[in-house]
Amino acid sequence: LGADPRPGDKSWRTDTIMVVAIDYQKDIPGGRPQIGVISVPRDLWVNIPGYGNGRINQADYIGEGRKPNGGGPALVSEILNNTLGVRTTRYVRIRQEGLVELVDALGGVTVTLDCPLNELTPNGRGGYNRFNLPAGENFLDGAAAKKFATFRYASNDFSRASRQQQLIWAIRERALQIDAIPNIPQLWQALSKTFTTDLSLLDVIRFARLGSQLDADQVHGVVFSTRALANTVMSGGAQVLIIRSRSALMAEVDSLFAGKPIADQLPNLAGFTS
């Protein structure tokens, strides 16, 4: 869960929601572990139990009022199960400044683009802040990585989700390059004010070691297509994504471990996947 609390605002939205699944393939002779990442669009219109219909990015904040029932992550998990048939058991919630600090702690990351990226985000003064990258390899510090992962007004959620998955892979590659796993306890301490999780430090180290041992073809990603989801405008004017075809949606969820590796998927900078 990627949260974006604003200064002076006690509420927040989780504009980044990723489901990470691991298939250890322990029962398959010669099986190799596979990791799958599903990006859930922030504007997906869902039923929020106990609240009504709304964007899925509202659910984490709404659920935080239900601490005895697991809070926001538990409510998001319930919605993911109801909507996608995906059951989640653990969570990590990180604020945007946590991403900035992590990338800077690694000394920056490199992403490769097959065409220029020209993105926008509102600046709060009636205009836009711009973020431009040329085609080819681009080095990103923490501030640039945040823009790469969050700007979307020149494209849409589909493009941003694709970029977010590529950024996760770039972070993994950089962590391996500098042998960062032994420094995870120090990173945990340094970033502790920017994230919450029900994982222990030992859990994180164990998952990091698993990730470091995987080849590129063992890490897959799903960004939902326009076969599954469609843009619409609600009666109140809200622009949201609704499920166009449940069968197509579930087929894309089921393809999680069969899709192209994240490392082979350049960001869909033009917008929608088809």
Language model: regions and residue ranges:
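Non-catalytic, solvent-exposed segments at the cell envelope interface
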Residues: L1-S274
